[in-house]
Curated annotation (Swiss-Prot):
Organism annotation: Pseudoalteromonas translucida (strain TAC 125)
Subcellular location field: Cytoplasm
HAMAP family: DNA_HJ_migration_RuvB
Binding site for ATP: I23, R24, G65, K68, T69, T70, E131, D132, Y133, R174, Y184, R221
GO cellular component: cytoplasm; Holliday junction resolvase complex
Keywords, sorted A to Z: ATP-binding, Cytoplasm, DNA damage, DNA recombination, DNA repair, DNA-binding, Hydrolase, Nucleotide-binding
EC number(s) reported in the record: 3.6.4.-
Binding locations of DNA: R313, R318
Name of the featured protein: Holliday junction branch migration complex subunit RuvB
């Protein structure tokens, strides 16, 4: 398993949500990055508001840490409605979901994180709720059992997932709006770092924000996490201002290199280079070589490496690119 203190792991850590909540943007006007998503959502939200209707059900997918929960809350704020949040693993029984649905008010947002982890029984309850705003529930047991239908207020379901391919077709097809979040540019992350530094009362130079952004793997959650560690370093070792030099010293100290890689990324890449001659190599072999779960490799380690052009997924397995060799000062494999 990846250690819980891995700073550039984009999955949320305990108590991190309460810290990040204070610095998250509340409205689309403050939302930076994802320009196509932002443009589309502005139109869809304004249209729904002008018609006095609930927004179509929205599916948000993409790697962890890119702001799926933030966007869900922004949608609710823009619509000026309540949002009730839960997650797929929490909804163990159909009754758990029924209790949430029956407490919604007209136009409210129901946010289900990790929606791909809903059980089939719970998912069956969602279908009529999403399509017809009705709840089908069973009363009684055995031969005397009967089904009754309850009308629900119009609501918007927002589902978030890192594994859109794991959704069943009937569920996926019921979302009228589907948005994919992409990794953020250094420019957008620099803005986010500067904004967060302001909320943390930390003096931040533009160059310092860029240095943090470059090592944040295109992910706001990681950028904010690294910012907090740089703040600690600055408080103890510097005069209180984060410039490029201070940011670089702090990030080197916590073992996040200029490409945003930590020991696990380097271990992954070196395993393919040294143990498997640069690939191709199957996921099972990589998982065994580095002592990591396949799902974690696919969901946490590989997306950024692929996006940055360090590895390729091919039908024959994983292959490292010349970039990976250059990162370690090695000569690429000759075919």
């Amino acid at each position: 398993m990846i250690e819980a203190d891995r700073l550039i792991d984009a999955t949320e850590k305990p108590n991190e949500d309460s810290i990040d909540r204070a610095i998250r943007p509340k409205l689309l006007a403050d939302y930076r990055g994802q320009p196509h998503v932002k443009q589309q959502m502005e139109i869809f939200i304004e249209a729904a508001r002008s018609r006095g209707e609930a927004l179509d059900h929205l599916l948000i997918f993409g790697p962890p840490g890119l702001g799926k929960t933030t966007l869900a809350n922004i949608v609710a704020n823009e619509l000026q409605v309540n949002i009730k949040a839960t997650s797929g693993p929490v909804l163990e029984k159909a009754g758990d979901l029924a209790a949430l649905l029956t407490n919604l008010e007209e136009g409210d947002v129901l946010f289900i994180d990790e929606i791909h982890r809903l059980s089939p029984q719970v998912e069956e309850i969602l279908y009529p709720a999403m399509e017809d705003y009705q709840l089908d529930i069973m009363i009684g047991e055995g031969p005397a059992a009967r089904s009754i239908k309850l009308d629900l207020p119009s609501f918007t379901l927002i589902g978030a997932t890192t594994r859109a391919g794991s959704l069943t077709s009937p569920l996926r097809d019921r979302f009228g709006i589907v948005q994919r979040l992409e990794f953020y540019s250094v420019e957008d992350l620099s803005y986010i770092v500067g904004r967060s530094a302001h909320f943390l009362d930390l003096e931040m130079c533009d160059e310092g924000a860029v240095e943090i952004a470059k090592r944040s793997r295109g992910t706001p959650r990681i950028a904010n996490r690294l910012l907090r560690r740089v703040r600690d370093y600055t408080q103890v070792k510097s005069d209180g201002t984060v410039n490029a030099e201070v940011a670089e010293l702090a990030l080197n100290m916590i073992d996040v290199d200029k490409s945003g890689f930590d020991y696990m990324d380097r271990k992954y890449l070196l395993a393919i280079i040294e143990k498997f001659m640069g690939g191709p190599v199957g996921l099972d072999n990589i998982a065994a070589a580095i002592g990591e779960e396949k799902e974690t490799i696919e969901d946490v380690i590989e997306p950024f490496l692929i996006q940055q052009g360090f590895i390729q997924r091919t039908p024959r397995g994983r292959i490292v690119s010349d970039n990976a060799y250059h990162h370690f000062g090695l000569l690429p494999k000759q075919d």
